[in-house]
């Protein structure tokens, strides 16, 4: 067998919050894949890091009264502790706020710039005339244009929940100097993504780099036309300064999404430095140099919401800077709990630490494995099904094989297994199934692998039920048959431990001690345990109790009063507004009514603006890339260009009408409508939602 050299990454968790079960889908999926490939004899390295840059980090640190550096250090320690609880076995865990990441970010930028792939243009923003700097929304305060509450931030009102643009604030002032800000233009740096369109079309369709559904979605983006990507941000900003900018101009910083994927390289370089001079030494260029692209493999596991960055920007950046591109990018769906999006009020927004206080992490690892496939599909953590499946499959089927057999062997035969297998055809069948299981693991068809493993467990239990060793033990002269039956059962149990080791590393480590063996690699399944002595059996796994799940849910519940949630007085205000004379047509007016059935046909969802760009050749359009909670983002055109710069809308949550028929336009296909209010002639305002709005939720 040829030993493959593989580098694997998971997307970097953001360093301003806790790890929750939704995050863990990806890290558990990646860890299982890495462990399975290592078990099959390949050389696999798994690296990750905290994504530690951006305005949000800076503001979080300010709220906590610490420096950004201390903030990200505290969060990284918490993240690593959570990952360890769930047995995520990184070879290295680093931070994007590192010298390695700075060096690689600057290297890539300079190579792109020198090759002519970087350009500049002016963007209009609020500016502090005293501090002489551009202001992010959270550095502007003023009077809310809706409810007149004072001292509200430049993106939303914490009193009435209204969201708005910073330029709409009344009596605005800079939180840094108290000065009244002015509108001013700023030079921003752009990466010329359209130059790489043909390369990306070829790359996304070659060598099975992407899942088919992802490649198809990318084709829609190609049809709509790629646009240049703003890679710069103005100070104040926590991140890396863009090098070599004119000395007479304000400092510019790399946008967090430029240096975040570079963090994969930085973490790997950090590991290379740690292992230098050891038997496990790694050569950075062996994995990342362009000429070695077909010698080694690089895989990124990501969520479906960041495909745009990993399948377009990232490979284009790498190709433009003469570095190797990923062998594959694997996207997964989101996590639902009890068929709905995670909810703090229902107690289903469950943090990793809260789960681990109540339940064993391997329960979740197995349940996720039983649900995950190679498709970009959401998975559902049904808590009742979770309890039943773990109790039935792991405790009732797998562990039960050992507990039913080991006692007879230890008590009557000093733990010795027979020298000859009494059921070679049965054991050969289960051994050969290992080939299918190994292939399912490699292809990320974990649910298929779990089904195959449980079929093997069923065969073992059927065999034990048929032979009834507990009854044979009472029959004089049947001692050899009892030993034969129990030895076959223990051998099958051993095979199941080989197959489950990538999913249940702690259970299988304990099983190795019981089985008195050192190796659970896939190759070891071909060597049956004959004339072998096992140790006394100890319980390997406990059943999940309903009370433990209930306690976890209760601990996860948050207060129903959240920032931006309507209060009674706000509801009264809304009701008053809707029943005012201006809002109610008189009995003599002939209003054009529609029935509730007609209105119900309109599907409106919360959408996150992944990207917003100008449309070359269209003076009225902006192009949105929207995450509406589906398998792939949507492309939507909106005629609001003269009222907004793209940067004002990127990252916002907006309302998208999602069941409009796709409209073919000169510049591509529009797959929905972004809702705005106002007069198209005098001014349109995009309706934005609070951060608490859940992507993909329907408006009611």
Curated annotation (Swiss-Prot):
Disordered as annotated region, ranges: 562-587
SUPFAM superfamilies, sorted: Anticodon-binding domain of a subclass of class I aminoacyl-tRNA synthetases (SSF47323), Methionyl-tRNA synthetase (MetRS), Zn-domain (SSF57770), Nucleic acid-binding proteins (SSF50249), Nucleotidylyl transferase (SSF52374)
Keywords, alphabetical: Aminoacyl-tRNA synthetase, ATP-binding, Cytoplasm, Ligase, Metal-binding, Nucleotide-binding, Protein biosynthesis, RNA-binding, tRNA-binding, Zinc
Domain tRNA-binding residue range list: 598-700
Binding site for ATP: 344
Alphabetized Pfam families for the sequence: Anticodon_1 (PF08264), tRNA-synt_1g (PF09334), tRNA_bind (PF01588)
Top-level EC class: ligase
ATP-binding found in the keyword field: yes
Enzyme Commission designation: 6.1.1.10
Record-listed Zn(2+) binding positions: 144, 147, 157, 160
Cellular compartment(s): Cytoplasm
Compositional bias of kind Polar residues: 577-587
GO biological process: methionyl-tRNA aminoacylation
GO cellular component terms listed in the entry, alphabetical order: cytosol
Cofactor note: Binds 1 zinc ion per subunit.
Motif ('KMSKS' region): 341-345
Cofactor(s) annotated in UniProt: Zn(2+)
Swiss-Prot/TrEMBL catalytic activity: tRNA(Met) + L-methionine + ATP = L-methionyl-tRNA(Met) + AMP + diphosphate
UniProt motif ('HIGH' region) ranges: 13-23
GO molecular function: ATP binding; metal ion binding; methionine-tRNA ligase activity; tRNA binding
Family assignment from sequence similarity: Belongs to the class-I aminoacyl-tRNA synthetase family. MetG type 1 subfamily.
Record note on quaternary structure: Homodimer.
Function: Is required not only for elongation of protein synthesis but also for the initiation of all mRNA translation through initiator tRNA(fMet) aminoacylation.
Protein name in UniProt: Methionine--tRNA ligase
The organism's taxonomic lineage, starting at the top: Bacteria, Pseudomonadati, Pseudomonadota, Gammaproteobacteria, Moraxellales
Gene: metG
